[in-house]
A protein has these predicted regions:
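Gly/Pro- and small hydrophobic-enriched strand-loop and loop-to-helix capping segments
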Residues: 59-61, 123-134
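Flexible, glycine/proline-enriched loop segments at strand-loop-helix junctions
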Residues: 104-105, 129-133, 160-163
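A cross-family phosphate/adenosyl-ligand binding-site feature
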Residues: 1-97, 135-170, 174-175, 179-193
Length: 193
């Protein structure tokens, strides 16, 4: 793995722990030799993360749609900033440039980006690791939702296992290094339909 895509908030969030883990993840990525691919903003957790990678002399590629250049305040000090035409192109470009995906705390955009790459994994479009950095239980209810979806037979246990959950950057990156995508022969249980 050379580059990891991180989805996270353009807000710093309510707790200092969110900002701290964004900086910790940035340093861990650089220390581990991973480049960062992210949404290209200099504000919120995105900016904290990118700055930490850059301060640790790591490579950072930002991908931002033209429409968000001013709204999200594009980070101009990156290794590379790619300006694309749309949100769809942003997500596809980020996915194409990355060998795995991590979600830090964030809002609707973060959840949407994460669930899209999980869906792509479920459909067999990629076999890259997808992970949650569950800071102070931020994603506990989302994880509970996934477990509920398994219990209600909307998600298979194999597909549920595609998401790696950790509470520290080092733990998550170690899990990514050893990640083996589950082999799923079918994604619909015909007996249950």
């Amino acid at each position: 793995m050379k580059r990891l895509c991180v989805f996270c908030g353009s807000s710093p969030g309510a707790r200092p722990a969110y900002r701290d883990v964004a900086a910790d993840l940035g340093r861990a990525l650089a220390r581990g030799g991973f480049g960062l691919v992210f949404g290209g903003s200099k504000v919120g957790l995105m900016g904290i993360l990118a700055d930490a990678v850059l301060e640790a002399r790591g490579d950072v590629v930002g991908v931002i749609p033209q429409a968000l250049m001013k709204k999200e305040l594009a980070h101009t000090g990156l290794t590379e900033l790619r300006v694309v035409a749309s949100m769809h192109e942003r997500k596809q470009t980020m996915a194409d440039l990355s060998d795995g995906f991590i979600a830090l705390p964030g809002g609707m955009g973060t959840i949407e980006e994460l669930t899209e790459v999980l869906t792509w994994a479920q459909l067999g479009l990629h076999r890259k690791p997808c992970g949650l950095l569950n800071v102070e239980g931020y994603y506990d209810r989302f994880i509970g939702f996934l477990d509920h979806a398994v219990a209600e037979r909307f998600v298979t246990p194999a597909h549920r296992s595609m998401i790696v959950v950790a509470s520290t950057p080092d733990e998550l990156l170690e899990a990514f290094r050893t990640y083996q995508a589950p082999i799923v022969d079918k994604w619909i249980d015909r007996a249950a339909t």
